[in-house]
Amino acid sequence: MTDSQDNRTPESPQGVDRKAEGGCPVLHDGVTAQGSESENPAIDSPTPRTGGRPNSLKDWWPNHLDLSVLHAHSSKSSPLDPGFRYSEEFEKLDIEALRRDIVEVLHTSQDWWPADFGHYGGLFVRMAWHAAGTYRIHDGRGGAGQGAQRFAPLNSWPDNANLDKARRLLWPVKQKHGQKISWADLIVFAGNVALEDMGFTTFGFGFGREDIWEPEEIYWGPEDTWLGDERYSGDRELSNPLGAVQMGLIYVNPEGPNGNPDPLASARDIRETFARMAMNDEETVALIAGGHTFGKTHGAGDADLVGPEPEAAPLEAQGLGWHSSFGSGKGEDTITSGIEVTWTYHPTRWDNEFFHILYAYEWELMKSAAGANQWRPKNGAGADMVPDAHDPSKRREPRMLTSDLALRFDPEYAKISSRFKDHPEEFALAFAKAWYKLLHRDLGPIARYLGPLVGETQIWQDPVPAVDHELVSDDDVAALKAKVLDSGLSVAELVSTAWASAASFRSTDKRGGANGARIRLEPQRSWAVNQPEQLAGVLDRLEGIQREFNEAGGAKISLADLIVLAGSAAVEKAAKDGGVDVTVPFRAGRTDASQEQTDVDSFAVLEPRADGFRNYLLENEKAQPEVLLVERAYLLGLTAPEMTVLVGGLRALGNNVGGSGHGVLTDRPGVLTNDFFANLLAPGAQWKASESEANVYEIRDLASGELRWTATAVDLIFGSNSQLRSLAEVYASADAREKFVRDFVAAWVKVMDADRFDLA
């Protein structure tokens, strides 16, 4: 792998450059904990426009609620035909022909960007790793699933320097196979093929990633310079939901925290960052060592000679950045990270050399030609053991990164590294599984995987059993609805349970949702937002109905299906009570996962900090509730109109956590009406913050001062924000009663079916 972690930063402005407790067991030779003078790459960061005339709503009104994220990636940005379906086009792909084409690229060195060691394997592994490695567990963003590495800011991050060349090398392959293979799939499949071509046996590969056509607005950190680290507080506590240690990095600084070459301090950063990618210690060691079995990093000269990144490069660069004026600027003169390291004796062959070399030598700190911190064997050991990447007559010693030495000197990592050194078969299997997880973590359930190369199902894919019974008929559905409505459960109880089951879905990494009925399992059944005591009672009643129906013989219904069906029956009843007859579409086919199929720790990150659809906000939450509502809507894949109609309808249905009356702006709770909007926008009201309850507002009659309603910021935003008010006005209108119900049902079904990839 080449330059997988090759970036550094100047000394932290927050003073966190320090050695780990107990000191470092590796000789530093008097090198300070300052960062290298030549960072990766040592070019100016993009300069945000300042002092100019405001040119956006946010410039004029910084607190303006931005809804644009709810309308990103619309069909208007795609050049593909309206009826295009990637899964159907993919079926036409000759996968073996694609593989052969990639292998040919791997072995065909191009003069405009020569291959290290005559093989682009290390470069392609790095490209795939960095595409997938942006994934983070806290909000499911990042990852390889959309081909986002093609766009800013990722295409211009310092950690992705010269990966523009890797994608350009692949362009003839993409051009040949067209829309039968997405860029998102091709980028990571090329890395997979590269590993196999260098002798590694992978765990498998699943296609199915669909391209986006515009950059995605993602919060990558608060910094406005490359390699800034304002994301820390306290004792180097990394802010959520971030994963990387510095702006513009995929993982950690390879020289050590903020350029401090301390392996033990580096281990702390590595453990935190990889955990936020859903990797445990064994997976972390396997990934780093497996990736660094291949290729090299690049620091041939002064990084000040490296030009701007792709987004800042001139038109004539045609999307390529980091043009270097050092020598030829390529081949043996390449500058990417400023670090000049080749880890193993055979950089294009899978083997166990990384660990043997790591333990075979004692290491001393040295500087690259670019001034970067790196490590070599003491006393000139290992000289002439490593080939030169471009001149077969030259040899050199093996070298390591500070982050590599962490795998030897951190006590927990050392146990794993030592075992992998002595048991190469365990290392190979661990790397195969960890690599598979890395590439597929954001692809979602196995139902989304395409192609014949898919590996054995893993628990991190949140598996659900296959359907093994006859599904319910329309008559069965009608009978079950009647049973549910006659069970004594209220509309609010049925709706809130169905919502809690389905609304855990995240469109980012396709996790959560109603399929599997994990609402009845830990950890979800104990989340405060899911009202555990009420939930237990509802589930007990529904399980009784399920048991009675299934014991009758014939068709069967899963609890996952019944929870959704029960909520839909409640919506139909509430609409009818409001004078509108409607049938909520229902498609059976969900199954029930077991606790053994559910990784409790993995699911814990899905617990919401806030859910504006339930008027729920975690105590001491600092973010604005209305901003968190938009975030929740985004994760559910909703548009602004869908978010609007759902909030209004769910308030009327009593979906608030704890039965709170905040935002229930109706005299007919439990009836599906547009009262929320009508009363919110009604003139003659005075709104003011409550003096007795935080984050609550009182709505009083302007003339009498009588308290009429209470609400939260999530409610008031639909009257305050001009864009949301325009939507609320549609649903508050006298002619909107039936439209409101229709739109609510459509949005409700969208959430209930969000994880039904089997229906796609």
Curated annotation (Swiss-Prot):
Query: Which residues of the sequence carry a binding annotation for heme b?
Result: 292
Region annotated Disordered, chain positions: 1-57
Enzyme superclass (EC): oxidoreductase
Q: Which GO terms describe its biological process?
A: cellular response to hydrogen peroxide; hydrogen peroxide catabolic process
Keyword field contains Isomerase: no
Which InterPro entries does the protein's record reference?
Answer: Catalase_peroxidase, Haem_peroxidase, Haem_peroxidase_sf, Peroxidases_AS, Peroxidases_heam-ligand_BS
Give UniProt keywords alphabetically. Answer: Heme, Hydrogen peroxide, Iron, Metal-binding, Oxidoreductase, Peroxidase
Recorded catalytic reaction(s): these are: H2O2 + AH2 = A + 2 H2O; 2 H2O2 = O2 + 2 H2O
Q: What is its EC number?
A: 1.11.1.21
A GO term from the CC aspect: cytosol
Kindly list the residues the record flags as site (Transition state stabilizer).
126
Q: Transmembrane segments in this chain: where?
A: none
> Which cofactors does this protein require?
heme b
Tell me where the cross-link Tryptophyl-tyrosyl-methioninium (Tyr-Met) (with W-129) is found: 251-277
Kindly list the GO molecular function terms attached to this UniProt entry: catalase activity; heme binding; metal ion binding
- How does this protein assemble? Homodimer or homotetramer.
- The identity of this protein, by name, is Catalase-peroxidase
